UniProtKB/Swiss-Prot annotation:
SMART domains: Arg_tRNA_synt_N, DALR_1
Protein name as catalogued: Arginine--tRNA ligase
Subcellular location as annotated: Cytoplasm
Molecular functions (GO terms): arginine-tRNA ligase activity; ATP binding
First-tier enzyme category under EC: ligase
SUPFAM superfamilies noted in UniProt: Anticodon-binding domain of a subclass of class I aminoacyl-tRNA synthetases, Arginyl-tRNA synthetase (ArgRS), N-terminal 'additional' domain, Nucleotidylyl transferase
A matching Pfam family: Arg_tRNA_synt_N
Transmembrane region(s): none
Reactions accelerated catalytically: tRNA(Arg) + L-arginine + ATP = L-arginyl-tRNA(Arg) + AMP + diphosphate
Length: 576
């Protein structure tokens, strides 16, 4: 039951009636601008619409005059109890009380299915996230993007999309050459040789394990092998070991990908060449000289002829180079080939999660996808910002002297998976987030995950102590009449819209904010019961009032449970 959609459909129906009477002008363009939403201020009613404002540009009347015309029909919408028009022409609605009581009944009948909406209609969507370089275990800096991508995938599945979770393995390029050289040193160390780790190599002690693994399997044979052969062996063993390590770290976060795509395999299968040929056939490739990039020093830049992609034809700021001076492909060329591969696998809708330092790739990648798909495919790029790790307000040192970083495993052992997953979604993804190890284990309202879980646990405690109650159909919910009870019901009614808008905007943090708001409203209501026995959920000798209040409490639990499950977090029945 999405109240906004219900009222919006009624408004559209009434607008068509007025259009048929020639009182207004209506078309699809006007309807596409129609807004029905919850106001930011409770004093402005329960819902508002901009209908009069969008119609005024097509009729020689002011928005306030048009609003008066609309009222003649809007007042007949049964869900609306009163209407108020405010300048410059917004129409505010108050919703009839019976609708709010139906919300409580509906939640208890549908339970966690109350917010089930189908906006995806089974459409395939590819969500690529994490895609960390396979050069070491995942440090905690990777967690935010990993959790964001996984929760977004859960959310899209809830609203009817067929989701494929994908990880792009960057197993080609300089960083892998450096990895292989670093591991070879650790292998030599395992054979008993003294080593010196030069600058530019990976110093992490975790590479010792790969060196030992190679020594156990090959003894000293690698020392005698040809350079090409031993480098291939070291590369294959290192990548397998490190990808298994990454998968284990992701599993600790509750994350599992469906598909792993290798950059090296794409290059081996000449996907870049096929992609470039397609762009050439579309006359989107040319050879030219780019202007000097802003911020570069003259001595570091020389004009040169390069193979360029006409990305400006598709909204980019400049055309993009596809080949380096030595003839090898640029990172961007490899990246558009990878998205060409996704398109070839039938994905018309792709979502890519990247760190905010990749903001420069947004326009060029969108341009490439448009070009490769004849504008039939889209890529939505979601950026995540950094995380400041604190311990009671003091910055936590992220790196160790060994060259290793604070890992996902370290943090999960300290505070638990569910805490990490929830806290990483307490800010919009492109905003810097503070993660305070002391705060996230506090049992107080200052700790959002505790506050939400405590609300759910309180309802579960209530249910364990509750007497037998009336059936939903036999309960008169009109006894829920206090201001706080009605405000809580109105908040619960927003849940289907919160889910739908979170999915449409690819912003799961909206759910976090909402769950915190629900928990706060419930704790306030609980607090009134501690002060006044008549405000408690269980009232002796009044089975109807008790039933109504318990159904209200259960509504809170169903919605919190539903929200936490989108996050792959287990709702707690008892606080520990």
């Amino acid at each position: 039951m999405n109240l906004i959609n219900t009222v919006k459909n009624c408004i559209v129906e009434k607008l068509h009636i007025l259009s048929d009477k020639k009182l207004i002008v209506l078309d699809d363009v006007i309807l596409s601008k129609l807004i029905v939403d919850y106001p930011n201020n409770h004093n402005h009613g329960d819902l508002y619409t901009n209908a009069a404002l969008i119609l005024s540009s097509h009729i020689k009347k002011s928005p306030l005059e048009i609003a008066e015309i609309l009222l003649s029909e809007f007042s007949n919408i049964k869900e609306i109890s009163s209407i108020n028009v405010v300048k410059p022409g917004f129409i505010n609605f108050s919703i009839s009380l019976y609708v709010w009581y139906e919300v409580v009944a509906s939640i208890n009948m549908l339970k966690e299915g109350f917010a089930n909406v189908n906006i995806g209609n089974g459409q395939k969507v590819n969500v690529e996230f994490v895609s960390a370089n396979p050069t070491g275990p995942m440090h905690i800096g990777h967690a935010r993007g990993a959790i964001f991508g996984d929760v977004l995938a859960n959310l899209l599945e809830k609203v009817g999309y067929q989701v494929v979770r994908e990880y792009y393995i960057n197993d080609a390029g300089t960083q892998i050459d450096v990895l292989v050289e670093s591991v070879y040193l650790r292998y030599k160390e395992a054979t008993g040789q003294d080593i010196v780790i030069g600058s530019g190599l990976y110093p992490g002690l975790y590479l010792r394990e790969i060196g030992k693994l190679l020594y156990e399997k090959y003894g000293t044979d690698l020392l005698e092998m040809s350079f090409v052969r031993k480098m291939k062996i070291i590369r294959d063993v290192s990548l397998e070991y490190l990808m298994n390590l990454i998968k284990e770290d992701l599993a600790l976060l509750g994350i599992e990908h469906d598909v792993f795509t290798s950059e090296a395999e794409l290059l081996k299968n000449n996907i870049v060449e096929k992609c470039v040929k397609l762009l050439e056939d579309k006359q989107l490739i040319y050879y030219g000289v780019l202007e000097q990039p802003k911020g570069t020093e003259m001595q570091n830049w020389k004009p040169r002829t390069q193979m360029l992609f006409k990305s400006t034809d598709f909204g980019d700021d400049v055309d993009r180079a596809l080949q380096k001076v030595d003839g090898s492909w640029t990172y961007f060329a490899n990246d558009i080939a990878y998205h060409f591969d996704k398109i070839s696998r039938g994905f018309q809708h792709m979502i890519l999660e990247l760190g905010s330092d990749h903001i420069g790739y947004v326009k060029r990648l969108k341009a490439a996808v448009k070009a490769l798909s004849n504008n039939n495919a889209t890529v939505d790029i979601k950026l995540h910002n950094t995380v400041n790790f604190l311990d009671d307000g003091v910055q936590v040192k992220m790196s160790k002297r060994s060259g290793e970083f604070l890992t996902i495993r370290d943090v999960i052992e300290k505070v638990g998976k569910d805490v990490v997953r929830f806290m990483m979604l307490t800010r919009k993804s492109d905003v810097v987030l503070d993660f305070d190890f002391a705060k996230v284990v506090e049992q107080s309202k200052n700790n959002p995950i505790f506050y939400v879980q405590y609300a759910h646990a309180r309802v579960c405690s209530l249910m364990r102590n509750a007497p037998n109650i009336l059936g939903i159909e036999d309960t008169d919910f009109s006894v829920l009449s206090s201001k706080e009870e009605i405000l809580l019901i109105k908040l619960l009614a927003k849940w289907p819209n919160v889910v739908e808008m979170s999915a449409k905007t690819a912003e799961p943090h909206r759910i976090t904010f909402y769950l915190i708001e629900v928990a706060e409203a419930f704790h306030v209501l609980w607090g009134y019961g501690n002060k006044n026995a008549n405000r408690r959920f269980i009232i002796d000798n009044d089975v109807n009032l008790t039933s109504a209040r318990i159904y209200l409490a259960k509504s809170v639990a169903y919605i919190i449970s539903s929200g936490l499950k989108i996050f792959s977090i287990v709702p707690l029945e008892e606080m520990h």
